[in-house]
Amino acid sequence: MFFNRKNTNLFFKFTLLFLFLFLLKIIPFNTGFEDSIDYLNNISFTISSHFKLNKDNKLKFKSSSSCLNDTLNKYKSHLNFINSHNKAIKAKNDFIKLSDEEISSYSMLSYNEKISLLNNTNYSLEDRIHIFLGSDLENFSLVYYNISTKEKVSINENKEFKPASTYKLGLNALIYNLSLNGKLNLNDTITFENCDYEDGTGLLCSKSSIGTYTIQELLDLSIIYSDNIASNMLTRYLGGRDEVKKELYSLLNINYPYSKSTITADIEYRILMYIYDNKNLPEFNHLIEVLTKTEFHDRLDKYIPQEIVAHKIGSNESYIHDVGIIFSDSPYILVIYTNGIAYPDEKIAQISKAIYNNYN
């Protein structure tokens, strides 16, 4: 037989030599050493993604010609793929555009491979998130806005979600605006009524007697501990949730029915932008400070420095959200809303980490 052990080893040596020459041919020599390494890493990832080459894939030889032809055909096919992608690799901030078919093909990647691709900046953030989430994308909404560069990425930004506790962020923004305009005093007090009671997050629900608190105290409780009762007391004081949203949307020029019990990522982005724009005012500076002191750290700030993340989570059954301002060297706003996706906390955390690492 031609393919005895000795000849098989020779064949593999020939294949490795062929692959080495193949790589030499396609790597652009006008790039620096680090760029070449990045280029090789990208090729390596693409090969492993498309052909699933690993230790368990072993070629079974029937004849020298059939084996060689199979191998050459695979590399020829992949060479065509790489050549087309080479044309798309441009200057920084340009991306390889993936077709719907290519995005669909990446659905077969393992979770760890999807994490690697999520951090691969050769591809657009939209495509990377699409591949990472797969079919969960339809129940996901995101707005990323870089305040320094003005870059904005939106995914399903007008899709409606129950706001859960992200409602409390707009409530705080409105009350601080009313205080600045002399329409209320943050030292005014509100006394608990039975209609304010709500179980869940917060400190007040565990007290045998709740009593009276200043508006400022209730605001801080509603953010740091996501206190439902504190939020309800403030909302009642202002005339109810519809009245709060009516005033807030009027303030921000938002054209959205305030009677709806839903919100969109675009609306939350505008609320955060308003807070950031007023960050130098004492009231809003304080709001940003308490947003960095929230007790919840399993989403936006799970893998990035907590002290730079001014954020508010929201959780209501299948609705899992996190929204905030990240005060990195290049500050940005990140809004993520989800409904019924698998492992939402971790997916929000991984997307947040990828954006922080790739854009700052």
Predicted regions and their residues:
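Short, well-structured active-site flanking segments
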Residues: N177-D196, D242, L281-N285
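Short Gly/Thr-rich strand-loop-strand
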Residues: L291-I313
